[in-house]
Regions:
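Eukaryotic acidic, Ser/Thr-rich intrinsically disordered low-complexity regions
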Residues: 194-229
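Structural detector for internal amphipathic alpha-helices that build alpha-solenoid repeat scaffolds
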Residues: 1, 11-12, 19-33, 43-44, ...
Length: 229
């Protein structure tokens, strides 16, 4: 199939929400495992303004196995667009393979907030108890309060796979919460505590949207009283 045919199928895929059309286009790209074929795949992924198609094309790199992830790792070194780089970090995180965590760690200190956000989340998907230590260290230097909240959320993701991390996460939150004042960060800390300890402090987290509701001040007060016991 020549370049014009692929381009034509891409335009067709862009113009529809059909999963079948999107998946067929991905399968067409996956037939070419050469460096040029993966580069073409990446260009279409990066270019797509169709969110459904973009998601399918992104996940397609994981279908390429280790070669696909290694290609993405090389893209992290050369990609100059911050949003595109953050999307690549996200995809590597979705591999859920600890082997690829070292690719992500340098971006915890990136100047761009979106890149740091995706790196934090990816650490939660890829990491284990050792990654908890890394996230604790990053928490101390992260100036964005909401991103500090996502660090705590990433710790919870690690807990879901590694239950032995529970106490060190709980202890960390107990130490850090009294000094925090940003409501969104406090809300994340509290719902994570609720998940890990099974103690209800008065907040609810929507399982679909992640939106947190409830009286944060009252919930924080309940946590602080528990800490002082």
């Amino acid at each position: 199939m020549n370049d014009n045919d692929v381009s034509s199928y891409y335009k067709e895929a862009l113009a529809t929400d059909s999963f079948t059309v999107h998946n067929n286009f991905l399968n067409m790209l996956l037939k070419n495992g050469s460096a040029l074929g993966m580069e073409r795949h990446y260009c279409y992924f990066k270019d797509s303004k169709n969110a459904d198609l973009k998601r399918i094309l992104g996940n397609g790199f994981l279908k390429r196995g280790k070669e696909g992830v290694l290609f993405l790792e090389e893209k992290l070194k050369t990609e100059t667009d911050a949003l595109a780089k953050s999307n690549v970090i996200h995809l590597i995180g979705l591999s859920y393979n600890k082997e690829y965590l070292p690719y992500i760690l340098p971006y915890l200190d990136d100047a761009d907030n979106e890149i740091r956000y995706k790196a934090i989340i990816a650490c939660g998907w890829l990491g284990d108890a050792e990654a908890i230590k890394i996230l604790k260290e990053h928490y101390a230097t992260e100036k964005d309060a909401l991103l500090r909240g996502f660090i705590v959320s990433a710790m919870r993701q690690i807990f879901f796979r590694h239950k032995e991390t529970k106490q060190q996460i709980v202890d960390f939150i107990y130490v850090k919460m009294p000094e925090e004042t940003y409501n969104e960060l406090l809300a994340i800390m509290i719902v994570v505590l609720q998940d890990l300890t099974k103690v209800k402090f008065g907040l609810k987290e929507d399982s679909c949207s992640g939106e947190i509701s409830g009286d944060i001040a009252k919930a924080k007060d309940k946590v602080l009283k528990k800490i002082k016991k």
